[in-house]
Each structure stands twice: as C-alpha cells, then as structure tokens.
C-alpha cells in the first residue's frame, strides 16, 4: 500500500515533470451540469432518433469542452449526453495530477462502452451518434473496434451510427515537436515516457505517432462496417501535428467525409481547443449529424 504522503510527494514531482516536458496541463474543475443535457428523461424524437454522446479530449472535461456545442444540440432537439473519463485509478502511480482523459485509452474506451449502454437503456434507442474531440475521437474508435461498439458481422446491430471526429488524434500526433524532444530525452537516458505517464497518464504517449497503441488501433483500417464517419480538421491545429493525420480512410461498408473547417471559408481561424466552441465548427457538427438540415443551413463564415 502506497501512503498518502508518498503520493502527495510524487504528485508534486509529477507536476514539475509536466512543466519540464512542456506538457500543456491546465487545471480542470469538476464537471457541472448544463441545463437540458444529461437528462435521463429525454426521449429521442422522430427527427433525431439517436442520442448524441459527447466525448471530451485529453485533460479536459465536459463542462469546459461542450459549453457551446451541447446547448446547440439540445436546442436542435437532440438528447445529449456527456461523459467524463480518464481520471487516476485508486492507488495508481500514473496520472498523479489526476487529470481527466489521462488514463489509458483502452480503459477509457471500456468506460465509454458502459456509458453508451446506459444511454441506450435510458432512452430506448438502439444506436447513438458520437462526437469526439481530440483524444475523444480515438476513445470512440477504440470502443467501436475492440469493445462492442460495432458488429462487423452484422452492422445492423452496431451501437454507433455516426462518429464526428473533431481534430481527432486519429493517426497519432507529434504534439507540435514534443515527441521529438521526448525522443531526444530518451536517447540521453531520461525516461521521458515513464515520467510522462507518471505525471499526466499514459494517454499522452499513446497518442504519439507510431505508438504501440496507435499501431494496434489503425491496423487493418481506420473504420468499421456500417458506421458513417465525419472527420473535421483545422489548418490552425497546434496539437494534432501534422494536421492531416486527423483524417480517416474508408474501409469496406463504411463512409468517410474529411473536411477542414477552412473549406469554403479560408479566413476561419480555429485552433485545436476552439473546435468545440467556434460557431463555424459547431455549425459543421450540426450539419454532420443531420446532413439534410446542413444542406439548408451552411455553417457560418466569419
């Protein structure tokens, strides 16, 4: 049993390590409910029969991430549900800063699976749509591939109909040169990977280009049969680098639409974190979930 004193001391060390590694950690407040969101009494309508599950990214939380998009979806008549995931597990000596989205992506995907089953049971819906930001898109893809979110032998039994990936780290990222800096540290004998997991959890390293996790996730193709994918990137992304690594390639039985926020609006300036709140990005999500609505309601262009 590790004493609380040891955990506190190591947590201080973890915070120092995070700063030295250049990891952009921000304090995350406990999630607060948004009116009309996460309503167990919400009944999907004929117009929007699938609940929408929102999956935040690394070191964020539902309140911070979805303060604009969740109400916009609610106002369009969707049943909207948000998950918070990836905090430090009891007695674990990883993610000592206890950040949301820090835990292993495999564990977070299993948590998402349980959450989706709860949403389906509460609403009576056979399927959900998922919007995932950054790591959230990868958590969703892991769930769909390995944890029961889809049924390749019988796609009609899929639990997920549509995945909208917002700046997803789908093919790994260099984190704007942090991966290179970490590799140099490892060559110099500094255990950067272990220190990063200690400080902020394993998900950070799992999202890097060429990681064992990314290799396994993308082996055999990016998609699952019967799922509609919309991958939205931004040319201003400083977290998913190179930015094109967010896009997906359709495999058998799946459809993929890849687009930039700047498509049709080259003046749009939207960074990684703004992908869930910028009015144009929000409009793109609404149109992705309801293409018929999107054809008559183009996303605003500043």
Task: Identify the residue ranges that each predicted region occupies.
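C-terminal catalytic-base region of ester-bond hydrolases, centering on the histidine
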Residues: 186, 222-302
């Amino acid at each position: 049993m590790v004493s609380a004193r040891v955990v506190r001391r190591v947590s201080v060390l973890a915070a120092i390590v995070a700063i030295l590694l250049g990891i952009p950690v921000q304090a995350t407040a406990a999630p607060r409910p948004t009116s009309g969101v996460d309503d167990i009494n919400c009944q999907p309508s004929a117009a929007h029969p699938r609940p929408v599950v929102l999956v935040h990214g690394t070191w964020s939380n539902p309140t911070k991430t979805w303060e604009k998009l969740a109400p916009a979806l609610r106002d369009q008549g969707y049943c909207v549900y948000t998950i918070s995931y990836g905090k430090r597990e009891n007695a674990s000596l990883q993610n000592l800063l206890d950040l949301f989205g820090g835990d292993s992506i495999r564990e977070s995907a299993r948590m998402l699976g349980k959450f989706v089953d709860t949403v389906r049971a509460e609403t009576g819906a056979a399927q959900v749509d998922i919007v995932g930001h950054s790591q959230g898109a990868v958590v969703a893809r892991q769930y769909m591939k390995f944890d029961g979110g889809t049924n390749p032998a019988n796609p009609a039994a899929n639990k997920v109909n549509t995945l909208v990936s917002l700046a997803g780290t789908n093919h790994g990222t260099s984190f704007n040169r942090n991966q290179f800096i970490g590799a140099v540290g490892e060559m110099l004998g500094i255990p950067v990977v272990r220190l990063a997991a200690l400080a902020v959890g394993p998900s950070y390293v799992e999202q890097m280009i060429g990681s064992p996790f990314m290799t396994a996730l993308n082996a055999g193709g990016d998609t699952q049969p019967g799922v509609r994918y919309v991958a939205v990137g931004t040319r201003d992304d400083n977290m998913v680098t190179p930015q094109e690594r967010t896009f997906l390639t359709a495999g058998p039985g799946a459809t993929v639409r890849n687009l930039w926020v700047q498509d049709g609006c080259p003046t749009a300036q939207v960074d990684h974190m703004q992908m869930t709140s910028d009015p144009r990005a929000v409009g793109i999500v609404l149109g992705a979930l309801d293409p018929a609505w999107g054809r008559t309601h183009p996303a605003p262009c500043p």
